[in-house]
Amino acid sequence: MAGVVESVPFEGSPRPTIGIEWEVALVDKVTRDLSNTAAAVFDAVGDLRAWDGTPQVTKELLRNTVEIVTGVHETVGAAVEDLRGTMDKVRRAADPLGVDVFCAGTHPFAQWSTQQLTRSPHYDELIERTQWWGRQMMIWGVHVHVGVSHREKVFPILNSLLTTFPHLLALSASSPMWAGSDTGYASNRTLMFQQLPTAGLPFQFENWRQFEHFVHDELKTGVFEQLGGLHWDIRPAPKWGTIEVRICDGIPTHAELAAIAAFIHCLIVDLDQRIEDGEQPITLPPWHVQENKWRAARYGLDAIVITDADSNERLVTDDLMDLLNRLEPTAKRLGCADELAYVATIPERGASYQRQRKVAAASQGDLVAVVDALVHELDR
C-alpha cells in the first residue's frame, strides 16, 4: 500500500508564468521508421539546463522519444525561443546518428512491437500494471504549464477550461494515422492515451480539499504512488504552482506551438482575472465535456461542439473566433498578441491532421512522404 497524505501543498505562483514541454520523436533518415536512439542523443547533447536549472532534455517511456523542456518564463515568445534553442541542439546531436526529429501525435506507420522501453522504476511499474495498453503508448504531446497564485483558484479555472477542450484539441490534432492505416480520427492519440487507468478527463472538484481527499484515496489504494502518476488531460502541478494543460497532440511547427501556447496562457489568465473580479466561471456538465472531447478527436476542426449547459451547439471554429476576440486584451497584457492572432490562421492553413492526409493523398498513400513532410515542418 502506498503512503497516504492528509494535505497536498500548492506552491502558488506569484505571477502567471509559462513553461512548455514538447515531446518529439526520433526517426531514421532513410526508412523514416522510429529510431530507438534516445540514449545516444542524450549522451551527445549532455546535461542541458535552462536559466533556472530546469533540465532541458528528459527521457520518456519509449527510447524513440525526447522531451524538450523550457525553464520558467514570463512570455510565450521567450518560452518558444528556449525550445527552439534546445531543439537545434537535439537535431545536431541526432544528425550524425542518421536520425531526424519530428513532432506529431502519432507516427503514421510504426509498429509498437519494435519500440524499446526506457528502464526506470516508474516506467517499469507503469508497464507491469498496464501491459498491452501501456506498450501501445507510441504517442507524443505538448504540455503547457501556467502559474496560478492560489490553490482555491485551481479547480474553478480547470473546470471552466474544460469548455475549451475541443478547441485546443481540434487546433493541435495531428494523429490521423496509426500503424499504416488512416483511423478516420483527427486525433487517434487522444483515444489511445485515455486507455491508461489514470489518464483522461479530470474530475470537476469544487475545491482543493476535495482534491486532497481524492489524492488520499488514490494513494491509499495504490492507484498511483505519487502525483506524477496522475495523467489527466488537465491537472494541477502543486510542486510548481501551475495548471498543466496536456490536451494537445504533438505540434509540428514552432509557429503553431507558439500560437496554441499563447491561447492556453491567455485562457488561464483570463479565467484567473474573472475569478478575481467575482465572476462565476462557465462550466459544462461532465457528459458534455466527454462528448466534446470525442467529437474533437473524431472530427477535428469540423466538430460541432456543445457550448453550454443548455445543450446548444456550434461549429468549433466559429466559437473559436469569438474566444480569440475576447482574449485579445489579455494577449496584449501578456505580450503574446501576435502569437494569439496566429491561432486564427490554423484553420485557414489546415491543421496537421489535414496536412498529413493531403500529403498521403498526393503521394498515392506513401506514408514515408508524410514523415518527410513532418520532418521539414520542424523548420517552420
From Swiss-Prot:
Broad class of enzyme this protein falls into: ligase
Entry's EC annotation: 6.3.2.2
Domain of life: Bacteria
SUPFAM superfamilies assigned to the protein according to its UniProt record, in alphabetical order: Glutamine synthetase/guanido kinase
Pfam entry (one): GCS2
Catalyses which reaction(s): L-cysteine + L-glutamate + ATP = gamma-L-glutamyl-L-cysteine + ADP + phosphate + H(+)
Main function: ATP-dependent carboxylate-amine ligase which exhibits weak glutamate--cysteine ligase activity.
Alphabetical list of PANTHER family matching this protein: GLUTAMATE--CYSTEINE LIGASE 2-RELATED
Family indicated by similarity: Belongs to the glutamate--cysteine ligase type 2 family. YbdK subfamily.
Name of protein: Putative glutamate--cysteine ligase 2-2
Source organism of the structure: Nocardia farcinica (strain IFM 10152)
